[in-house]
Amino acid sequence: MSEAQNKISGSGRIGYYVAESLEPVYREIAGLLGVSLGPNLRVALDADQEASPGRQATPSQAVPQHSAEMPNREKMPNRWLLSNVDAILVEGISLTRLKELLLNYSGQKTKPLLLVCGSVSGENSGFRLKTFSFSLGSEGSRLLMEGRDYTEKGVGEPSLDLMLEEIREVLRREVRNYLELPPIPWGYAYAMTLTHDIDILSLKEMPIARTFLGYFYRSSVLNWKRWRSGKVKTAEFYRTIWEMVRTWAAKVGLGQDVWQRALPTLLDLEKRLGVRSSLYFMPFPEKPGILPEHLREAKESAPANRAAFYDVAKYQTLLAGLEDEGWEAGVHGIDAWHDVQRARAEHSRIAVLTGRDKLGVRMHWLYFQSPDSFKALEEGGFQYDATFGFNEVVGFRAGTLQPYHPLNCQTLWELPLHIQDGALMGEEHLDLNREDAFRKAQPILDFAKRFGGAVSLLWHNQSFTAPRFWGEVYERLIAQGRKDGAWIALPRDVLHWFTCRRRCRAELSTEGTHWQISCALADREIIPADPSRSAGQSIPAAQSTRLDLADLSGPSDPLAPRIPPVRIRLQIEPKRVKSISVPYEVGQGYIDFPAQTLIRLEVEGED
């Protein structure tokens, strides 16, 4: 079979040629792009330059792992590396050495596409060259590790996703039959995670101090102001007054106070809506923790009202019941953000109560200090952090809708926070009415429809009762997500899906009009979940073996929901495709498939 008859191209045959300091961020960027990062050409070329005449150099970085014809890595010439990439990302480095090798390589019919981000030196004439105005590596590092300040212009736009989309558009246009893995679960438009910080479980447990008295201030003075401005309805205004009376009675042992009923109200709402969420509980009572350095003035200790006034150990039955009924219990951290030992203690406290070791965390009051906090949380044993967002506004602190691995971590996921109730409607922040709050948050969902990813919502349990009544906006955002076709799932399930996407390798092989797409993990074959939920069509053909993505996490949990398959996107004019062996969705200039061991296509005309 000649080379013309059997062509193979991988999902994202992308090499990179960047300054050494930018290598970690480019490895993470490859995961966000949905491609498997190929050779580090800077290292490979340095090795080639140092090799003695006639001796083959050994690249120190991994090459694409999906090619069936890949030679022995220890004997792999660097020219083979160049012939097996469709594009090379370049930033912060001279093109002179790369140009020399590319020009001298006569065996390569088509020179790789050079994607130049930011400033580079050296001549680049004669190449397939696309330049971008942004420095993807340096700006990506800043966004993923430090994040933007809420006062920065444009925090309401996912700046990193916008940069990545510019690169994707060039790859789709310039690389023939380009394969990618979009951050969009099969059968859905995007993912949505619902989360709740459980700061308070009961007012009557609290001393008559700032937080307790603050409730009465909000229920009287602010309640009146919000009623006069139309932010609460008349019935809600009077209900708030009545709840104040009931709360004073509860303080002396007569009945339940309003915030004792907040969590049951929240859970009943989610049962009615058929959704589940993650609830983050304070691990220890009466510990306010310490302040981040940028907030310290006279003392190190955080304000006393940052402490919890409930002992989570007394609620073990509640936490176990939540897990049994499909919710997720996590940690609302106190000092885990700055101290590994305290991170381990806070993790252990909730792990013992839930019987689960893989836990998420969100720091109370969003205390965080990058880059040290990421590492402390990873070494503390957490699976993911959900802190990276704003108290003051809604938007994109990390510039992306996608979960990601912080650049100084190996296992920790960061699940960025995008929409918070207090930022929208809190009197100390945007102070919007409910209609304006929904409209302010809706553009974030619109970006998710455009780019995929995972929208993260935070609603405190006390927001579902008097005097706030903010549950209406929460319910509307869930309804909008469903209308959009969002997969509303627990954070751990969403991260399971993104783990599958990172590990999935897709390969296209063509033989005349017969095409095949094969899928495997980086280290073994996979099997995704049932792809029957599809908005596209299915053309009968030879039955392919299905892949079960639950295989990634060991024995299946009988209570765990089905995880949707990874989505594979092939850039091809849909009218050329005559038959497909799996369900599919048609887009403008592309076709999407659910990940399968083998996908067969009959295509009109040889490529």
Feature map (PLM): residue ranges:
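Acidic, His- and aromatic-enriched active-site or binding-groove loops in soluble protein domains
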Residues: 218-220, 296-326, 353-359, 381-391
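Secreted, luminal/periplasmic, and some membrane-associated catalytic domains
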Residues: 289-293, 325, 340
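Acidic (Asp/Glu)-rich catalytic clusters
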Residues: 266-274, 308-329, 347-354, 405-410, ...
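Catalytic domains of cell-wall/extracellular-matrix polysaccharide-remodeling enzymes
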Residues: 22, 26, 335-413, 457, ...
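Terminal accessory/targeting
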Residues: 1-54, 66-68, 72-306, 410-537, ...
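Generic enzyme active-site microenvironment
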Residues: 195, 330, 362
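Glycine-rich phosphate-binding "P-loop"
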Residues: 305, 329-340
